[in-house]
């Protein structure tokens, strides 16, 4: 299972692009990459455009990241979600907690 994380820091925003699969094997590495960024107190924008699969362990990572950015005064926006990922956040109720309104794939 492959996972790639690319990070770009600006003054108040950290932009992250995630590519690959987020599952039980890759979620710990993703958490290890994102948690220090979340604790900087900046706004965190995470593009999931190139994420081909995510399971519940991936959701758990984003819940933890959401809590960390809120503790430090930042915000979390997930961008470019596929229809499959939007549905995953919808059926779990997390779309009402985590902002997934960033640019959606397909212009939604």
Curated annotation (Swiss-Prot):
In-chain residues carrying the UniProt-annotated modification Phosphoserine: 52, 56
Alphabetized NCBIfam families for the sequence: ant_ant_sig (TIGR00377)
A Pfam entry, by short name: STAS
GO molecular function, one term: anti-sigma factor antagonist activity
Lineage: Bacteria, Bacillati, Bacillota, Bacilli, Bacillales
Residues modified as Phosphothreonine: 57
SUPFAM superfamilies registered for this protein in UniProt: SpoIIaa-like (SSF52091)
Protein modification: Phosphorylated by RsbW on a serine residue.
Keywords linked to the UniProt accession: Phosphoprotein
Residues covered by the STAS domain: 3-108
Name of the molecule in the record: Anti-sigma-B factor antagonist
């Amino acid at each position: 299972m492959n996972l790639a994380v690319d990070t770009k820091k600006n003054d108040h925003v950290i932009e992250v692009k995630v590519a690959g699969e987020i599952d039980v094997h890759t979620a710990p590495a993703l958490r290890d990459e994102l948690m220090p960024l979340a604790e900087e107190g900046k706004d965190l924008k995470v593009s999931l455009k190139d994420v081909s699969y995510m399971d519940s362990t991936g959701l758990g990572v984003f819940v933890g990241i959401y809590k960390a950015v809120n503790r430090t005064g930042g915000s979390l926006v997930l961008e470019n979600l596929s229809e499959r990922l939007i549905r995953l956040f919808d059926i779990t109720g997390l779309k009402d907690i985590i902002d997934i309104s960033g640019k959606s794939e397909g212009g939604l």
